[in-house]
Amino acid sequence: MGRRYWNINLEEMMEAGIHFGHVTNKWNPRMAPYISSKRKGIHITNLTITARFLSEACDLVFDAASRGKRFLIVGTKKKAADLVASAAIKARCHYVNKKWLGGMLTNWSTTETRLQKFRDLRAEQKMGKLNRLPKGDAAMLKRKLSTLQAYLGGIKYMTGLPDIVIIVDQQEEYTVLRECVILGIPTICLIDTNCDPDLADISIPANDDAIASIRLILTKLVSAICEGHSSYIKKG
């Protein structure tokens, strides 16, 4: 896997607030190698290290995308939800941005059953079948469809387990990370100063609370995935 240039700029990262961690008493000592200083009671991460790991992550996703691999992006906290959806759609990735249903990956057969039910209901709605049902039944099925859309809408075209999972918030998405570890699925994870850097395959030290920080990281990863997809299509 060759190294490429991903236009990762330290000044741009600083402007996005990527270096701001949590208050110093809410930290994981394992993050010590990634922290450069303390400022006004807050840990500051080393942006040079962040840039290196982000570049490695971009190399990895480019290489995977150029070989036709499938990606899943997960970020369910409110401030990340829209960013996750737009990034995933741009890069033609699957995504989960509302709620992670436990076992979504480890109990894949159950997820497949839910997805089939979702597809069937969507088809029935498009053909107008729901409108021909008694009002109460139609209302119940429409509510079910709305729930399935919220939880499964981003993975509706997923036909198997992903090859790489990108996780926006380690603490929030710990269940996802554990499922990936169990299944041996490689992970790329944003890690703030209260996280464990050893859990993901590539951990990117970054502020996982600021929208600008999340957006910048996802933008770089998505750009690399899109370049990889283009390379795959040309090879095909």
Curated annotation (Swiss-Prot):
Stored PROSITE patterns: RIBOSOMAL_S2_2
Swiss-Prot/TrEMBL keywords: Chloroplast, Plastid, Ribonucleoprotein, Ribosomal protein
Bilayer-spanning residue ranges: none
The organism's place on the tree of life at top rank: Eukaryota
Biological-process GO terms, alphabetical: translation
Record-given protein name: Small ribosomal subunit protein uS2c
Record localization: Plastid, Chloroplast
One matching Pfam family: Ribosomal_S2
Entries under Gene3D superfamilies matching the protein: Glucose-6-phosphate isomerase like protein, domain 1, Helix hairpin bin
InterPro entries the record matches: Ribosomal_uS2, Ribosomal_uS2_bac/mit/plastid, Ribosomal_uS2_CS, Ribosomal_uS2_flav_dom_sf
Lineage, top ranks: Eukaryota, Viridiplantae, Streptophyta, Embryophyta, Tracheophyta
Family: Belongs to the universal ribosomal protein uS2 family.
Organism encoding this protein: Phalaenopsis aphrodite subsp. formosana (Moth orchid)
GO cellular component, one term: mitochondrial small ribosomal subunit
Single annotated GO MF: structural constituent of ribosome
